[in-house]
Amino acid sequence: MKVITTVKDMQQIAGELRASGKEIGFVPTMGYLHEGHATLLRQAKKENDIVILSVFVNPLQFGPDEDFDRYPRDIKRDERVAKEAGVDYLFYPSVDEMYPAEQTTKIEVVKRTNVLCGKRRPVHFAGVATVLMKLFHITMPTRAYFGMKDAQQVAVVEGIVSDFHIPVTIVPVEIVREADGLAKSSRNVYLSEQERKEAPHLYRSLCIAKQKIEEGERHPRNITTVVKEYIEANTNGIVDYVDIYAYPALTPLEIIKGRIILAIAVQFKNARLIDNITLTVQ
């Protein structure tokens, strides 16, 4: 595995690989890799000739009161996980390398962002879209892999790729969970011992909701009320949202039908956790 730190070198390597007919699988991350990331990397390894992993904590997607400075970083651990998963190139640029001058252009995402996490984080998806546009041009991937834990991000990225005719296939990968159901996340390290015991109730609430939908419940508010009440009864977290939308359009539903997402966000003392399930309902 080679570690690349400059845009020029990464772009040159990617260009030569594509020119020689190699298919590139790309996994963009902010580092502090866990089993969820490793799952993305292993799938990329199976489906492509070359795997490029990026580790870059992108300042543009953090708001002024968010945890950019506190976000966990451990590049040695990331290198170890990457090697074990068969990564060929680890792209590890500095902030100055990615943003050497003040941006003259940023991408504004106008759909799929005014709900769920985007509602509370107004700069987030503009930052995500901007850095991904840069990374796609730098790494020139055939396929790019994203975890469905951030299903809103997947929907936004699919929109960007479609709108700008970017020649990359987006591959969504199912959420990887701990044995007790908690979605794996770099931010789980922030949880206290008691919060870690409570956190699996997020996924349990989604499973209860799924069962009710399978039993015939079709009114979104009835489902979201059950989920909210369950979380409030079983955790000390504060429910940020419990919402049901059409997926990937992320538009409201009067009746649960078609492909839908049920998504939740819960604020614990030092960590805000998100989770979701997607279903196709007849």
Swiss-Prot record:
InterPro entries: Cyt_trans-like, Pantoate_ligase, Pantoate_ligase_C, Rossmann-like_a/b/a_fold. CDD domains: PanC. It is an enzyme of class 6 (ligase). The active site is at residue 37. Keywords: ATP-binding, Cytoplasm, Ligase, Nucleotide-binding, Pantothenate biosynthesis. ATP binds at residues 30-37, 147-150, 176, 184-187. It comes from the Bacteria. It is found in: Cytoplasm. It catalyses: (R)-pantoate + beta-alanine + ATP = (R)-pantothenate + AMP + diphosphate + H(+). Its EC number is 6.3.2.1. PANTHER family: CYTIDYLATE KINASE/PANTOATE-BETA-ALANINE LIGASE, PANTOATE--BETA-ALANINE LIGASE. The reaction proceeds by a bi uni uni bi ping pong mechanism. Belongs to the pantothenate synthetase family. Homodimer. This is Pantothenate synthetase. It comes from Bacillus cytotoxicus (strain DSM 22905 / CIP 110041 / 391-98 / NVH 391-98).
